[in-house]
UniProtKB/Swiss-Prot annotation:
Organism expressing this protein natively: Kluyveromyces lactis (strain ATCC 8585 / CBS 2359 / DSM 70799 / NBRC 1267 / NRRL Y-1140 / WM37) (Yeast)
Origin organism lineage: Eukaryota, Fungi, Dikarya, Ascomycota, Saccharomycotina
Transmembrane segments: 66-86, 133-153, 176-196, 243-263, 270-290, 327-347, 360-380, 387-407, 421-441
GO molecular function, one term: alpha-1,2-mannosyltransferase activity
Protein's recorded name: GPI mannosyltransferase 3
GO cellular component: endoplasmic reticulum membrane
Length: 601
């Protein structure tokens, strides 16, 4: 009897898991999670926020933040609706007291108390929505992406299944493929930690997963199908968000073209060309409209992105990693506990099916994509773990099919006792992986998020200043206040003036941003950019200071122990509270707790 796994139920399972995970996540990973997605969306939805230089320069497409703007807008109108409902209820209570119990002291006290309810309800709902709506949006997107990875695994299984196995438990193997893929994707450490965070790389991986499912893995048999057109549209749209995603599609497209040419299917080749043109037109037109909406003029950010990252040396401003970074660091972190299976998959066929040409084998194509992409990404000077995250669907597919291949090869000869032991311990790594990711998602660097929530809760604030490495905390996407007169932080803009300088490569190592100047000589920076902290009478006559001492001062413990604690002695500042942030940190400047100083009147 067939033991089919209900795929629709799987989507619900993934969705619940990712929603819980997203709602529990309260830590900071990297600045782009907030500053390149939520902050511009907040700026457009609520009319205030801080746009980084990338948005002023036109380097980013607004397609990804637009999703969050839609969520924010719904939240805003939901809050207004609730305010109107509560206001109506308050008015009815007022009418009741005035006409029925006009002499009741308690009634009038209740009316007085309720006057602030509508505004408070609106503020509460709006703030909670601003915090949690993006999390739920990413949870839904993550579930869609991971569900399509499972569908892709099922599709590849059916395509590569040896027909001679039809009567030999193929239904059981089918269920095994789906179940293994579910466990592999849901329990993957980096998926658990990263996929529901509002990074463009998460969005890129999700779109890539969906597009790969609709891709024609027969190398041309289904080129004329609507599913293939959907794959091309999503794929080209993804490239417009992250140009390096083209590394994937150029390789898969190259395989398809080569197979069509070798088999002399010229009509199919012509159909492919037409489909690519149509898909590109749809994607580019859509993206142009979205970016015109944000920027107010026609622009193609992907061209500026390529210019900044490929034709200039300015990307090195954000760090240069060794050539083997992705091999020895990114791959183990992104692939997680399935890394041994991923490596082993390159040394076995993964399928018994014989194809008319080896070039048609989907697993060969996938291995080529992984190998060449890792090489190409390794050639880029600036490297981060998340840059290879779009390859995650390939990592999972190769790991799952390699695990099944090993199970088939050695499972039949293993003893019952061995198989029982294996079935019991096989859950250890997935469970440990999920627990470890949740500990990081709830504890490590939690202070940088908690401090913004705390500042939001303070009723009346005149000014806030952050003396710490730039973009160390979220901004209005978590603070959500436009009633603070001064809200500032130390900056770190790159040397855009070197973009067209032929000597940029030589000058770049000597460029220092504001954060660099701060930590290079803290006391000098304070003297040059801040007035005396003790008395206004000590200010230099006529001198303009970059910053004024704020009512609330936010710093890391490292700066406090190095300088600020002694510097603020006998000043009007007292330590109001502190938040745990990390036990250890790769950046010493961000080590320890986050401390809030309050300047007393």
């Amino acid at each position: 009897m067939s033991n089919q796994v209900p795929l629709k139920r799987l989507f619900k399972v993934i969705l619940v898991i990712r929603c819980v995970q997203a709602l529990l996540t309260r830590t900071f990973f990297q600045a782009d999670e907030f500053w390149q997605s939520l902050e511009p969306a907040h700026y457009m939805a609520f009319g205030y926020g801080e746009l980084t230089w990338e948005w002023s320069f036109g380097l980013r497409s607004y397609a990804f933040p637009l999703i969050f703007q839609i969520g924010y807008t719904l939240v805003k109108y939901a809050a207004i609706s609730c305010e109107l409902i509560v206001q109506t209820a308050t008015d009815w209570v007022l009418l009741f007291v005035a006409n029925v119990i006009p002499n009741s002291e308690f009634g009038w006290e209740m009316v007085q108390e309720m006057r602030s309810f509508p505004e408070e309800i609106r503020g509460f709902i709006e703030y909670q929505g601003v915090i949690y709506a993006p999390k739920l949006i990413m949870a839904v997107l993550a579930a869609i992406g991971e569900f399509h990875v499972i569908l892709l695994a099922e599709k590849l299984y059916k395509l590569t299944m040896d027909k001679s196995d039809d009567s030999k438990g193929s239904d059981k193997k089918h269920s095994t493929v789906i179940n293994f893929t579910l466990v592999a994707t849901v329990s993957n450490f980096f998926n658990c930690f990263f996929i529901t965070r509002s990074f463009i790389n998460s969005f890129e991986m999700i779109l890539t997963s969906v597009s790969l499912y609709y891709w024609d893995w027969t190398s041309g048999e289904h080129i004329e199908s609507f599913d293939f057109l959907k794959s091309l549209i999503i794929g080209t749209f993804t490239v417009l968000q992250r140009p390096t995603n083209a590394f994937i599609w150029l390789i898969l497209g190259g395989y398809m073209i080569l197979n069509l040419v070798l088999s002399k299917r010229w009509r199919k080749l012509f159909s492919l060309l037409i489909k690519v043109i149509c898909a590109s037109f749809i994607s580019i037109s859509t993206n142009l409209c979205i970016d015109y909406y944000f920027y107010g003029y026609i622009t193609i950010p992907v061209l500026k992105f390529i210019k900044f990252n490929c034709t200039s040396s300015l990307s090195k401003f954000y760090g240069v990693a060794p050539w083997n970074f992705h091999v020895f660091q990114s791959l183990p972190i992104v692939a997680g506990y399935s890394l041994p299976l991923l490596i082993h998959s390159f040394f076995c066929s993964l399928t018994k099916k014989r194809f008319l040409s080896p070039l048609v084998n989907p697993f060969l194509q996938i291995k080529t994509v992984v190998l060449l992409n890792v090489i190409l990404y390794s050639l880029i000077p600036h490297k981060e773990f998340r840059f290879i995250y779009p390859l995650q669907p390939f990592f999972i597919i190769l790991s799952v099919f390699d695990g099944i291949w090993l199970l088939q090869k050695y499972g039949s000869t293993a003893t019952t006792r061995t198989m029982e032991f294996f079935s019991q311990v096989m859950w250890i790594l997935p469970v440990v992986s999920m627990v470890a990711s949740m500990l990081l998602s709830t504890l490590h660097e939690s202070g940088t998020v908690a401090v913004m929530d705390y500042l939001h809760s303070i009723r009346n604030i005149d000014s806030i200043g952050f003396i710490m490495p730039c973009h160390s905390t979220p901004w209005q996407s978590h603070f959500h206040r436009n009633d603070v007169k001064e809200l500032w932080a130390i900056t770190c803009s790159p040397p855009l003036h070197l973009l067209t300088d032929p000597d940029a490569n030589a000058k770049l190592p000597f460029y220092m941003d504001e954060s660099d100047y701060l930590y290079d000589n803290i006391s000098k920076f304070m003297y040059q950019h801040f007035p005396p902290v003790f008395r206004k009478s000590l200010r230099s006559p006529g001198k303009q200071y970059t910053y004024e001492w704020p009512e609330y001062l936010v710093i890391f413990e490292d700066l406090d122990s190095q300088f600020m604690n002694d510097y603020l002695v006998d000043s009007m500042y007292i330590e109001e509270t502190r938040f745990f942030n990390s036990l250890v940190h790769w950046d010493k400047r961000r080590s320890g707790d986050i401390i809030i100083y309050h300047k007393m009147p």
